[in-house]
Amino acid sequence: MQINIVPEFKNDRDIDAVKSIINNCVHCGFCTATCPTYQMLGDELDGPRGRIYLMKQMVEGAPVTEKTQNHLDRCLTCRNCESTCPSGVRYGRLVDVGRRYVDERVVRPLSQRVQRWLMRETLSRRGIFSFLLGVGRSVRPFLPATLKKKIQLAPSAGQWPAATHKTKMLLHVGCVQPALMPNVDAATARVFDKLGVELVIASDAECCGAIRQHLNDHHGAEDQMKRNIDAWWPHVENGLDTIVINASGCGVMIKDYAEILAHDPAYADKAKRISAMAKDVSEIMPTYAAQIGTLAQNKRQSATPERVTYHPPCTLQHGQKIRGSVETLLSGLGVTVRLCQDSHLCCGSAGTYSILQPALSQELLGRKLTNILKTEPQEIVSGNVGCINHLQSGTDVPVRHWIELIDRMI
């Protein structure tokens, strides 16, 4: 797809990437077959190919309107299209930049600007989010049903391991998960402890930057990325070489630090190192599969469910291209693991999407849960805090992180 950039965009730092990505698109349309919003709305402009046309027209000088903004807003950034594309079009990177271009040229209504500011300043700040979540939980009985389902009561985190080990890895804890689901980090730490690995938390590390990045506050996102690098770097210099991530939405973001900060001479090399160190917990566990199997056999936990349905997060299967490792690990422990029909499709959480596009998000949730419940699971497991919370809001079947299942078994 040839492209002729107008002078207005030629000096933008991301325009070379935009041009390269658009040039790779051969407009074959394979992406539309797996795009959730195209399937729901049936509009070419609500599929990846149509959105690429809109972004191409924009940088070639076509007027940028609310119509362009709305079609890009409705994209989940699930990156299912990237898994389908035979040409390797990096659509997720393109739409992030395209949204920034649009927001720099189309002023949003005041209500949208306020909503997005509130999300940026609360969800991405651990202390503020924790406080507000506590307030929400205290008034939960009086909240509307849809909001009540989103604000679950605080789960018990259990004991954090006190032992120290020679082998150490960093654990990224992020912004939302410590308050919303502290049990996930604690379970992760216990599993690694039993495997002889101590997880270290850098106290000054914060949100990975994904929330601000996807809400088009790219400068704010990059500031958070740099602060994280600064927080982790002393540990890197002390020999730690792995950052364990148990929220795949954070993982896909941290793995992109290298590209996003490539323009910054003070951080480019460090960002490249950090991205290489970032590992989803599902990338690490297979190394310890035999040890986990022995521990599980010795414990013989009768409370372990016999049948679970695994929902692979989009940020894991499409964003990080990690597939099959969770199912293989759990199956090796004797758990019957099922995938539902259309397991490649998004559940509708998609970070802040469930807040910004509630109708589309709820339709996707309904479709996903209909397919999941057909598998008759005793538990539903996933690997991302947003997916877990979103799925749990629509069903009484327990939804947990799969690492919690491992924690119970060993």
Language-model regions, residue ranges each:
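N-terminal, well-ordered alpha-helical segments
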Residues: 33, 53-57, 70-73, 79, ...
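N-terminal glycine-rich anion-binding loops that anchor highly charged ligand groups
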Residues: 29-33, 43-47, 199-201
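Iron-sulfur cluster-binding electron-transfer modules in prokaryotic oxidoreductases
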Residues: 14, 91-410
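Generic N-terminal leader/targeting and pre-domain segments
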Residues: 1-28
